């Protein structure tokens, strides 16, 4: 076997052709992590709604608000959308129906079994799935040092999430129910595919168009799911105080702003690196739970959580630096 530099693919050429801000591009891996941190900010606002609204009803309202905000963008980007092609449209449709709509519902449903440790430990399969899909779909190849470094990131997240009882996942997997595990695994697979397919679609369209399509195409899917679950009566439970400020805040911060930042950064970040940076989400969610009410649940903060957070941040910074400094990736070919 010998290693030869591979000529840029059509996909890579399209990505390179897109204009970007050099400062943003330089810190793209870090910005993916910032976007993932913003996703976790919805915990405070969502807690004010779960008393009388289901997860599906909350997601439908959030998606409808963001779609309303982005409709002018979608109208102005019709020329941009013509660059997608059949495979691009399939990718965007799968993101909207899978990563945006179905994955959130599956992940939330997995908690209904009361086996939280099993849900979180299976969620850690998301980076592995995304890295595998990036290898298959995008042809991404990582150098040998990437794998132990990624393992450190996974271990760091484990330290944060299971600081109180490191053996909790073992007990949960022994006593857990298959249904809860399958739901969590399904959500992880859909979110992982969303990262890879999003990176693929961004080779043809702008991050504004990608964000607009994700929410707009997901809305009818979510409406159908809500109708199947609750019927027309499911849309009568909303109150004005739900929208201002809670649903509006969810739509703007972890919804609109976070996804715009995420896709802008993802357009300059390999999917296999982005999926590691996305692990800032469970870490942030766990740390928010340590905040005093009403922001969090006043859970104790452990030294291992601080260490784990530092390790994950170090890995993300290293990946961001290596993305800029490393020479072009090569692929192994037959001698």
Where does each model-flagged region fall?
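Hydrophobic/aromatic residues within transmembrane alpha-helices
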Residues: 49, 58, 62, 110, ...
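C-terminal-most transmembrane helix of multi-pass membrane proteins
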Residues: 2-18, 145, 243, 279-335
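C-terminal transmembrane-helix exit sites in multi-pass transporters
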Residues: 69-77, 126-151, 283-307
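Helix-helix packing/entry segments at the starts of transmembrane helices
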Residues: 35-36, 58-61, 100, 117-125, ...
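Transmembrane alpha-helices of multi-pass small-molecule transport proteins
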Residues: 2-13, 27, 52-102, 129-133, ...
């Amino acid at each position: 076997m010998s290693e030869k530099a591979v000529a840029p693919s059509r996909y890579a050429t399209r990505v390179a052709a897109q204009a970007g801000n050099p400062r943003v591009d330089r810190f793209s891996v870090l910005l993916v992590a910032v976007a993932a941190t913003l996703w976790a900010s919805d915990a405070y606002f969502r807690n004010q709604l779960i008393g009388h609204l289901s997860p599906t009803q909350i997601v439908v309202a959030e998606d409808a608000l963001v779609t309303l905000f982005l409709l002018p963008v979608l109208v102005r980007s019709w020329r941009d959308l013509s660059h997608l092609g059949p495979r691009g449209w399939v990718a965007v449709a799968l993101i909207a129906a899978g990563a945006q709509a179905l994955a959130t519902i599956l992940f939330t449903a997995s908690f209904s079994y009361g086996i939280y440790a099993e849900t979180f430990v299976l969620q850690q399969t998301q980076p592995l799935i995304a890295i595998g899909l990036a290898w298959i779909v995008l042809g991404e190849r990582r150098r040998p040092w990437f794998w132990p470094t990624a393992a450190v990131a996974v271990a760091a997240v484990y330290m944060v999430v299971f600081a109180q009882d490191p053996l909790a996942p073992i007990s949960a997997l022994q006593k857990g129910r298959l249904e809860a595990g399958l739901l969590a695994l399904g959500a992880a697979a859909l979110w992982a595919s969303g990262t890879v397919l999003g990176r693929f679609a961004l080779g043809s369209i702008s991050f504004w168009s990608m964000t607009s399509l994700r929410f707009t195409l997901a809305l009818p899917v979510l409406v159908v799911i809500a109708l199947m679950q609750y019927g027309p009566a499911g849309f009568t439970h909303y109150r004005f105080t739900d929208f201002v400020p809670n649903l509006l805040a969810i739509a703007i911060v972890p919804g609109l702003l976070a996804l715009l930042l995420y896709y802008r950064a993802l357009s300059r970040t390999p999917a296999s690196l982005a999926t590691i940076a996305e692990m800032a989400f469970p870490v942030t969610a766990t740390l928010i739970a340590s905040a005093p009410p009403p922001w969090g649940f006043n859970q104790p903060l452990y030294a291992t959580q601080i260490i784990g957070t530092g390790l994950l941040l170090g890995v993300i910074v290293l990946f961001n630096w290596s993305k800029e400094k490393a020479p072009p990736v090569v692929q192994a070919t037959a001698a």
